[in-house]
Amino acid sequence: MKRLFACLLACLALVLPVRAEPIRWVDFDVSTESMAYAMQQDIRTAEQEKHLGWIEILALAACRTGGKCPLSAVKKAAKDLEGDVSPEEAAGELGKYYAYYYEAYSAALGGLVGSYAIFKDGQWVPQYGLKTFSPIAAGYGYSHCDDFGVGRSFGFKRKHLGNDLMGGLGTPIVAVEGGIVEAMGWNRYGGWRVGIRSFDGKRYYYYAHLQKDRPFASGLEIGDQVDAGQLIGFMGRSGYSDKENVNNIEVVHLHFGLELVFDESQKECNSEIWIDVYQLVRLLSAHRSSYQKTDRGWERVYPYKDLDWTEFPA
């Protein structure tokens, strides 16, 4: 075990960025349980003098464990940070790795927890907590497994850089986080797809294999600003074709991917940073956006505003 840990640290040393250079590699290996516990501490202490940020907790646990972040290490990190000590000091000799993990996890998770408001019973209700949503709308079933890195062969041999969520044809798909629609249309691999960049520019969310003939939410266009939980499209099985609007995927599903962007040169290149989102999808499954179909189309049951990016609605 000690030898394995030493090897992990040695590998990390090779990719730790000189501060003038952007991070070029992230192995996101944090369990749902670890994220949930750290998030609970963040929410619990949000209004206390000593606020425990969940990213600080996870980054401290990660630099102590070579990025593995077991729940026991996360609990210890949270307890240690309750005192008057910085994360770097709490990590001791391993504190030199803290900055890397903090930046990496901030890019992966930075937009997930914060202040938001929902419109309920005739008024806007401010809240603090998980402000992002499962990509699958409330009331619709799905299944998935950790398939990140599984081989793919259409076009060329490559690794699967996302998580496939199997569900029913036409299942409403929503934006996990708010941002700007950066890509939209046909792709020979992903079929009908939407790409949304987070407001801070660090996260690029990719939603692919949308429904033939009716892939996108009405009126959605490139350049639009979308809210977390906003309807963006419908589940299908389009793709694997140079010709548009073709179903060559055998099973109806959503391909959901997350790319981290520390520098614009990384956005489209041979060394893009896509992370395993399986555990993240599990975390988000408890927070789903509700829609109802009316004569006017699909309508959100509880309108939403991200208060970290917009003012409190009048």
Task: Locate the predicted segments by residue.
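Sec-dependent signal peptide recognition
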Residues: 2-10
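Conserved, short, structured surface segments that act as functional micro-motifs
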Residues: 224-295
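Structural recognition of the beta-strand scaffold that forms the well-ordered cores
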Residues: 164-166, 173-175, 195-197, 204-208, ...
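Zn2+-dependent peptidoglycan hydrolase active-site motif and core
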Residues: 176-219, 243-251
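Cationic-aromatic interfacial patches
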Residues: 3, 17-99
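Surface-exposed, glycine-biased beta-strand/turn segments
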Residues: 84-192, 228, 282-314
